[in-house]
UniProtKB/Swiss-Prot annotation:
SUPFAM superfamilies listed in its UniProt record: Pseudouridine synthase
Top class in the EC scheme: isomerase
Catalytic activity entry: uridine(38/39/40) in tRNA = pseudouridine(38/39/40) in tRNA
UniProt name for this protein: tRNA pseudouridine synthase A
GO function terms (MF aspect): pseudouridine synthase activity; RNA binding; tRNA pseudouridine(38-40) synthase activity
A Pfam family matched in the record: PseudoU_synth_1
Role, per record: Formation of pseudouridine at positions 38, 39 and 40 in the anticodon stem and loop of transfer RNAs.
Isomerase keyword on record: yes
Family per record: Belongs to the tRNA pseudouridine synthase TruA family.
Residues noted as binding substrate in the record, renumbered to the chain: 110
Length: 241
């Protein structure tokens, strides 16, 4: 049975995340609807991860199997002709039958954008967290570096099921082109809300609203994250295969 990989991007503003939910607009739902229309059969799409409502993706991996052997370029053109304007597929590739978007991924890179100004930027507002108080970026950089390495991130996620919460956060970097602040995080996988809670906690500590003792407890898997950064600043930037 032919197995196809999709690479796509989407603006998450008007979506209730990736995963299909009854009576709600989701990215998975839109893609399955488009593929079913093109292929004239029910299609189930597997995504590389969940995304929360309002979160964006610059690079998202999905796959699906079909009864039909469809030319890649023809399928790419057909998909982009049907999908809504806030979703774009930029690559379609036939892969081995064993490929699974959820389990074949080797890592992910997330980007979080902060607009650090009292004046709203209307072009970045849907894609960033506006923080009006001035952030000391050197303090923020030092705090973020403490998240690097292997830690128990239990206190920085929402535990919906029993799973391993010890993760090696390979890289956390900060890029400042003031007032735009960009935070990148790389790991083999992430827990739900993990990136948003790392960013939210680091920003609140750098603003002096929480002590660094809170951070030490969180990195030992104790307590609960004091703040979750809003979803619109979060972008899945790269999926590593």
């Amino acid at each position: 049975m032919p197995n196809y990989l999709l690479r796509l991007a989407f603006v998450g503003t008007n979506f209730y995340g990736w995963q299909v939910q009854p009576n709600l607009r989701t990215v998975q739902g839109e893609i399955q609807k488009a593929l079913s229309q093109i292929l004239c059969e029910d299609v189930k799409v597997t995504g590389c991860c969940r995304t929360d409502s309002g979160v964006h993706a610059l690079d998202y991996i999905a796959n699906f199997k079909t009864q039909k052997d469809f030319p890649e370029e023809k399928l790419l053109k057909a998909l982009n002709g049907i999908l809504p304007k806030d979703v774009g597929v930029y690559a379609v590739k036939k892969v081995s039958e064993e490929f699974n978007a959820r389990y074949s991924v080797k890592g992910k890179v997330y980007l979080y954008k902060i607009w650090n100004s009292e004046v709203r930027n209307p072009f970045l507002y849907p894609f960033s967290w506006q923080v009006k108080r001035e952030i000391n970026t050197e303090v923020l950089r030092n705090i973020l570096k403490k998240f690097e390495g292997t830690h128990d991130f239990r206190a920085l996620t929402k535990l919906e099921e029993e799973r391993n919460t010890v993760i090696n956060l390979e890289e956390v970097s900060l890029n400042v082109e003031y007032p735009l602040i960009e935070i990148r995080l790389k790991a083999s996988h992430f827990l739900r809300y993990m990136v948003r809670r790392i960013v939210g906690t680091a920003v609140k500590i750098s603003l002096g609203l929480y002590s660094e003792e809170v951070l030490e407890e969180l990195l030992q898997g104790k307590g609960n994250s004091p703040y979750t950064a809003p979803p619109q600043g979060l972008h899945l930037e790269k999926v590593l295969l």
